[in-house]
Amino acid sequence: MLAKRIIPCLDVRDGQVVKGVQFRNHEIIGDIVPLAKRYAEEGADELVFYDITASSDGRVVDKSWVSRVAEVIDIPFCVAGGIKSLEDAAKILSFGADKISINSPALADPTLITRLADRFGVQCIVVGIDTWYDAETGKYHVNQYTGDESRTRVTQWETLDWVQEVQKRGAGEIVLNMMNQDGVRNGYDLEQLKKVREVCHVPLIASGGAGTMEHFLEAFRDADVDGALAASVFHKQIINIGELKAYLATQGVEIRIC
């Protein structure tokens, strides 16, 4: 059995790490490189960086900090933000990123997933999916351009359909960003995760809602996700990564102890 992964998420805007609640009202957390270094030293298995306004601004992720992160950490990291071409991806990987993640550009042009997977290998192509639960209809819908709330839009895709589509096109991993839970810290949406897990045959990463160590345990034990991504509980030092991993190990979760 592969070890479950703990993945801090760093949302980047204007060269700094920020964090919002339900993708709105972002506050500045701190500088990118020191935070990345801290999480690596605490025992994170991987880091994910989202340049949250790159796609909505029509630009690619700012590459200047990518190489600096690569110099100071020795764990894999994934970068996302406005990657719309093979050239964009090649540059970011050449600066030291281990994986690239695409979200809004994949919705605009799904063939991008296949072209990236063919060129760089499925193992480094992650598709991020921003999913919103509509309580009125009881359905999960994929959103686009979520980094800028004034431009966010609901797509025609239902989440479960899009999860299956991106796998057909070559996604090597899926990060499910559950927008209703984002930053609220009241737990992952286990019901949605279980439904997605049934149709997701590549590694699945849960994102949005972690507030306690038990929330991580529930995601691994009840929804069988491969990794759990979180931001505010780590940024605000509510949960220490080393202590979290020790707790999960005592609960029988296969985890890399540092």
Curated annotation (Swiss-Prot):
Changing C124R: Loss of IGP synthase activity. Weak HisH activity in vitro. GO terms for biological process: L-histidine biosynthetic process. Its EC number is 4.3.2.10. Keywords: Amino-acid biosynthesis, Cytoplasm, Histidine biosynthesis, Lyase. Disulfide bonds: none annotated. The keyword Protein transport does not apply. InterPro entries: Aldolase_TIM, His_biosynth, HisF, IGPS_HisA/HisF, RibuloseP-bd_barrel. One of its GO terms (molecular function) is imidazoleglycerol-phosphate synthase activity. Changing C124A: No change in activity. Optimum pH is 8-9. The keyword Hydrolase does not apply. It catalyses: 5-[(5-phospho-1-deoxy-D-ribulos-1-ylimino)methylamino]-1-(5-phospho-beta-D-ribosyl)imidazole-4-carboxamide + L-glutamine = D-erythro-1-(imidazol-4-yl)glycerol 3-phosphate + 5-amino-1-(5-phospho-beta-D-ribosyl)imidazole-4-carboxamide + L-glutamate + H(+). GO terms for cellular component: cytosol; imidazoleglycerol-phosphate synthase complex. Pfam families: His_biosynth (PF00977). Its main location: cytoplasm. It is an enzyme of class 4 (lyase). Heterodimer of HisH and HisF. This is Imidazole glycerol phosphate synthase subunit HisF. It comes from Escherichia coli (strain K12). The lineage of its organism: Bacteria, Pseudomonadati, Pseudomonadota, Gammaproteobacteria, Enterobacterales. The gene is hisF.
